[in-house]
């Protein structure tokens, strides 16, 4: 098991060189969107995704989309297919962006398509990772350096070409907080473009690099058109280490990073992959909820549990890490979802709080 802080230090000079940032090539990874195939300029390095994608949801009016009936799990989750278990697979970005920009008058469909930039380089080595290992390793054959200005030009071109709104720019990875300068520079460019929302993913491991640019980063993170999703890996230190390949002692660093985001007035959301090892699922989830509550009493209500699909790259990672004795857990993910949403959260929160979208939950 490795030290992810040392790994981040090694990766940083490869991810940021001469004022340009290393961006993963999406083409050829199986992650590109089919419809984009003829838009080579974008789909080679950037990708687009719809977050509300079910036809019956896309046809709803904004008021209908804000109904609490769309929250939580479908009835009988344990006998449903995993793919369909959540009524809404993702609230972020469409709902979070709409809410931050226009409150509940906002239309989530205006923020449903995200122009996604994937930085190459991650200091974890997760066994479920959706990114192909070579794409995530600062490998020059699978990535290219771009200035922020060049990236924003691609975004503007995409906005002109698509006949539906693209108002969200998502920065994912890799771990982008190893080079937080990217987020700062990108926001400063996006600020000049009306109506954009910046969504930042992080694995909550790179506080040192965040603190090095504290003032500029804080200034970006507190803006209304910025949201951050911190992805916790596992509900306890043992599971964290099996999932990420990092030493168990770094489990607590995730909470320190989340605290830093909260202290800096970030609109913070949490992802939790539905991966729990062993039989004590409820006990582990309960313990994790308590750890989040110690940071902020409402933080568990801002969690979106992630379905771990066997996408082509994820399948390769699962097979590779299985050989390193880090297979993904055998626990049925539906059981993890059921425990989180139907058993543990109702133990701590009222019906009224449970019927809020994550973005409505005050921190
Ligand atoms: S899942 Fe995220 S944190 Fe984990 S290795 Fe992949 S990019 Fe890094």
Regions found by a protein language model. Give the residues of each.
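Auxiliary Fe-S-binding modules of radical SAM enzymes
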Residues: 1-60, 256-363
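N-terminal [4Fe-4S]-dependent radical SAM core
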Residues: 19-118, 133-137
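Short N-terminal secondary-structure initiator segments
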Residues: 57-76, 166-185, 206-208, 212, ...
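Short loop/turn segments at strand-loop or loop-helix junctions that form parts
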Residues: 118-120, 128-132, 230-236
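Short, conserved acidic/polar surface loops in the N-terminal third of protein domains
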Residues: 127-130, 138-142, 181-183, 210-212
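Conserved alpha-helical substructure of the radical SAM core
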Residues: 133-169
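Conserved AdoMet/S-adenosylmethionine-binding subsite of the radical SAM
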Residues: 155-168, 173-303
């Amino acid at each position: 098991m490795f030290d992810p802080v040392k790994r981040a230090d090694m990766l940083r000079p490869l991810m940021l060189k001469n004022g340009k940032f290393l961006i993963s090539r999406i083409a050829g990874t199986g992650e590109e969107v089919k419809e984009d195939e003829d838009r080579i300029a974008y789909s080679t390095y950037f990708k687009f995704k719809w977050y509300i994608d079910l036809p019956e949801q896309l046809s709803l009016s904004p008021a209908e989309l804000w109904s609490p009936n769309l929250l939580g799990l479908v009835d009988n989750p344990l006998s449903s297919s995993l793919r369909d278990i959540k009524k809404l697979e993702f609230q972020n970005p469409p709902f979070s962006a709409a809410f931050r920009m226009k409150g509940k008058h906002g239309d989530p469909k205006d923020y449903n398509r995200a122009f996604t930039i994937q930085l190459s380089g991650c200091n974890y080595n997760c066994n479920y990772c959706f990114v192909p290992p070579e794409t995530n390793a600062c490998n020059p054959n699978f990535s290219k350096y771009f200035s922020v200005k060049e990236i924003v030009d691609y975004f503007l071109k995409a906005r002109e070409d698509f006949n539906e709104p693209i108002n969200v720019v998502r920065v994912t990875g890799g771990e982008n907080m190893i080079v937080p300068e990217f987020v700062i520079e990108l926001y400063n460019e996006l600020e000049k473009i009306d109506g954009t929302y910046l969504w930042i993913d992080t694995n909550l491991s790179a506080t040192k690099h965040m603190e090095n640019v504290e003032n500029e980063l804080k200034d970006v993170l507190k803006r209304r058109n910025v949201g951050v999703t911190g992805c916790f890996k596992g509900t306890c230190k043992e599971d964290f280490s099996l999932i990420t390949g990092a030493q168990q002692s770094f489990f607590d660093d995730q909470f320190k990073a989340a605290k830093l985001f909260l202290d800096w007035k970030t609109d913070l959301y949490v992802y939790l992959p539905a991966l729990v090892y062993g039989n004590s699922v409820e006990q582990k989830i309960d313990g994790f909820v308590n750890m989040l509550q110690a940071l902020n009493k409402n933080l568990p209500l801002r969690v979106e549990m992630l379905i771990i699909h066997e996408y082509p790259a994820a399948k390769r990672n699962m097979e590779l890490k299985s050989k390193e004795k880090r297979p993904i857990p055998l626990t049925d993910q539906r059981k993890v979802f059921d425990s989180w949403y139907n058993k543990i959260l109702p133990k701590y929160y009222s019906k009224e709080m449970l019927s809020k979208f994550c973005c409505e939950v005050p921190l």
